[in-house]
UniProtKB/Swiss-Prot annotation:
Residues 1-40 are annotated as: Disordered. Participates actively in the response to hyperosmotic and heat shock by preventing the aggregation of stress-denatured proteins, in association with DnaK and GrpE. It is the nucleotide exchange factor for DnaK and may function as a thermosensor. Unfolded proteins bind initially to DnaJ; upon interaction with the DnaJ-bound protein, DnaK hydrolyzes its bound ATP, resulting in the formation of a stable complex. GrpE releases ADP from DnaK; ATP binding to DnaK triggers the release of the substrate protein, thus completing the reaction cycle. Gene3D superfamilies: 3.90.20.20, Head domain of nucleotide exchange factor GrpE. Homodimer. It comes from the Bacteria. GO terms for molecular function: adenyl-nucleotide exchange factor activity; protein homodimerization activity; protein-folding chaperone binding; unfolded protein binding. The keyword DNA repair does not apply. Pfam families: GrpE. It is found in: Cytoplasm. HAMAP family: GrpE. This is Protein GrpE. Its main location: cytoplasm.
Length: 197
């Protein structure tokens, strides 16, 4: 046997061995180039990641500021609306004693006396006129009886036994209450019915 034949593995021709070794060398070369990553590429990747993070933070900040501005605008609109709606509250509170006095005058007036009829009629017209004016500005009277007690609009002064009115319902009004655009400015002082013992 010749020396060439001895070195080649069985069943392989010398050209095949050379080709196999050449493929092994090529396979090793890409690994070597992958290990030699350019440091500038790493720096570029880092900078791109930092830029993306900064853009995200900036976008979030802008959205947050826009949301805060929108909330501020809404709150301001609500405050202005409430200011317009309830600007008369102090004025109405000052008028309530006058309305109460007119109510009391009608309660104690001797309506059967013909000499007093003109005065009673004048008080009634004045009271009606006053109530019409305040109603134009959103004031409503709380003076219903035989309705369930509502702590938002009623202040219970006493409980009275009653057969006519269901327990827990308003039996009588001692002082009328008033609301301004749905907000209670003075609760009605009421007596509440209770079951007989």
């Amino acid at each position: 046997m010749s020396s060439k034949e001895q070195k080649t593995p069985e069943g392989q021709a010398p050209e095949e061995i050379i080709m196999d070794r050449h493929e092994e060398i090529e396979a090793v070369e890409p690994e070597a180039s992958a290990e030699q990553v350019d440091p500038r590429d790493e720096k570029i990747a880092n900078l791109e990641a930092q830029l993306a993070e900064a853009q995200t933070r900036e976008r979030d900040g802008i959205l947050r500021v826009k949301a805060e501005m929108e909330n501020l605008r809404r709150r301001t609109e609500l405050d202005i609306e409430k200011a317009h709606k309830f600007a008369l509250e102090k004025f109405i509170n000052e008028l309530l004693p006058v309305i109460d006095s007119l109510d009391r005058a009608l309660e104690v007036a001797d309506k059967a006396n013909p000499d007093m009829s003109a005065m009673v009629e004048g008080i009634e017209l004045t009271l009606k006129s006053m109530l019409d004016v305040v109603r134009k500005f959103g004031v409503e009277v709380i003076a219903e009886t035989n309705v369930p007690l509502d702590p938002n609009v009623h202040q219970a002064i006493a409980m009275v036994e009653s057969d006519d009115v269901a327990p827990g319902n308003v039996l009588g009004i001692m002082q009328k209450g008033y609301t301004l655009n749905g907000r209670t400015i003075r609760a009605a002082m009421v007596t509440v019915a209770k079951a007989k013992a």
